[in-house]
Structures are given as structure tokens and as C-alpha cells.
């Protein structure tokens, strides 16, 4: 349980982190360097999984000036290329390993759609399928 003073400190800390992210992203965009992102760059979000925390980061990147398509590239193809694994991961192609999610809307139009995951496939196994449940009713 967090005491009220702790909640205030977390909010102030989150604001400082958001400001750092904004400054960092704006410098990246200005420099033109390729950017990769992943769950290891997310700050602490109480009660959220790494995936949820990563999706929570996307609006901050957008608000700092990064277009949604570039955000999606940062966590897929760019990350794979920077790891030197583009032949194995980073895009959906035959022979590549891919964990997949599905959302109802278009994340290029509204990046927060990635916070509303409806389907998850990890390692070839369906982990979550809210789409099938909705259609079977």
C-alpha cells in the first residue's frame, strides 16, 4: 500500500521521467538516428506487466513528436535490426519467430489502441482471445 506522500512522490517522479523522455525523443528525432524501444526502457508502473508498461510508453513518445508508425517500427523492425536479428524477428514473415497481438482499432491513427489488446499469441500458443469470446456470444 502506498501512503499519500508516496503517491505524490511517484507522480512527481513520473513527471520528471516524462520530461526526460520528451527531451530524449526530441533529440533523437532532430538527429535522425534510428531509434529502438522495448520493455526494458519502460519505467516502473505499479500493477502493470512489462507489455502493459511498454504500451503506456507509446503516448509519451507520440507526445514528444514521434509519429505512431515510427513508434511501431521502433519496437519491431528497428529493434530487430539493432540487435542484428532481423533475419529472425522484427516482422511477420515465413520462418521468423513472432509473438503477435491484435487490437480493435488502428494504432497508426490512435497509438493508445495498443493499450487495449484483444488477442495475444506467444510462442505459437494463443494466450488471450477476447475476439473469439465476443463473436461466440
Q: Which residues does each PLM region occupy?
A:
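C-terminal cap/linker of serine protease catalytic domains
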Residues: 1, 46, 132-133
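C-terminal cap of metal-dependent C-N hydrolases
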Residues: 81, 94-136
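Generic beta-structure capping elements
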Residues: 1-2, 40, 123
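His/Asp/Glu-enriched, well-ordered alpha-helical/loop segment
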Residues: 9, 19-104
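Extracytoplasmic/secreted cell-surface and envelope-processing proteins
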Residues: 5, 45-48, 111-112
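Metal-coordinating catalytic core of metallo-dependent amide/deamination hydrolases
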Residues: 1-11
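Substrate-recognition/specificity elements adjacent to catalytic centers across diverse enzyme folds
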Residues: 14
Amino acid at each position: 500500500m502506498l501512503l499519500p506522500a508516496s503517491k505524490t512522490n511517484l507522480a512527481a517522479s513520473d513527471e520528471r521521467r516524462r520530461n526526460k523522455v520528451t527531451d530524449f525523443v526530441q533529440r533523437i528525432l532532430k538527429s535522425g538516428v534510428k531509434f529502438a524501444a522495448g520493455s526494458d526502457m519502460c519505467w516502473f508502473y505499479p500493477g502493470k506487466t512489462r507489455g502493459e508498461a511498454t504500451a503506456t510508453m507509446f503516448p509519451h513518445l507520440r507526445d514528444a513528436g514521434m509519429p505512431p508508425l515510427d513508434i511501431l517500427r521502433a519496437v519491431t523492425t528497428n529493434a530487430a535490426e539493432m540487435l542484428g536479428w532481423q533475419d529472425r524477428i522484427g516482422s511477420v514473415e515465413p520462418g521468423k519467430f513472432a509473438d503477435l497481438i491484435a487490437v480493435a482499432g488502428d494504432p497508426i491513427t490512435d497509438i493508445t489502441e495498443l493499450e487495449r489488446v484483444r488477442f495475444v499469441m506467444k510462442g505459437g500458443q494463443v494466450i488471450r482471445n477476447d475476439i473469439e469470446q465476443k463473436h461466440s456470444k
